Amino acid sequence: FALLGHGLGGDVALDLIRRAPDRVTRVVLMATDPLAEAPQIAAAREARMVAARSGRLAEAMREEIPPSAIADSPWRDEILALVGDMALGLGEGVFLRQSRALQRRPDQQKTMRRVKLPALVISGDADPLVPMRRQEFTANLMPYGKLSVIADCGHLASLEQPEAVGDAIEAFLNGPVMLR
């Protein structure tokens, strides 16, 4: 099967590949950081977790995905509202578990070097949370990795530029499975 993961979902996809490499045929990673979380980012995340535990989940989400994480567009506010509503709908417990998982995520570089299957890394050209240089690094870690940069796009590519993301994924999935 083919896998696609965004952010923490990309970490989950890499873990599945590590555990069952023969079951995965292709992987798409979006806004996925292959490195363990830096101490200063983990500390800032801890402050957001305290806010969420104190009944301020909406505030924590505004800090987790700030307006600057979304490329300037007429629908920026709509995307931020959607993300905030999703977080509130899922609740504090999910936010806390996901935050803790991000804080504890392992360095995935070794796993990525072993990914011997077609891999597509999708990056927004204006993503400040997982910048394009990091995404380029991610693609280059994998022997068959390819980078697709989405223009006028921040951290949430599938919401900001859904057609461009869909086109990139479709071309990748319909492409040959031949490896370099």
Where are these regions (language model features)?
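Short beta-strand immediately N-terminal to the catalytic nucleophile in serine-hydrolase-like folds
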Residues: 3-5, 30, 122
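Gly/Ala-rich beta-loop-alpha elbow adjacent to hydrolase catalytic centers
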Residues: 5-9, 13
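Flexible "cap/lid" loop of the alpha/beta hydrolase fold
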Residues: 14-63
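Conserved alpha/beta-hydrolase catalytic His-Asp/Glu region
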Residues: 37-40, 56-114
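Glycosyltransferase donor-binding loop in the core domain
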Residues: 87, 127-130, 154-160
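Short beta-strand/loop motif that positions the catalytic acidic residue
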Residues: 115, 121-123, 127
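Short alpha-helix in the alpha/beta-hydrolase fold that links the catalytic acid
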Residues: 117, 131-140
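Catalytic active-site module of serine/aspartate enzymes centered on a nucleophile-bearing elbow/loop
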Residues: 144-180
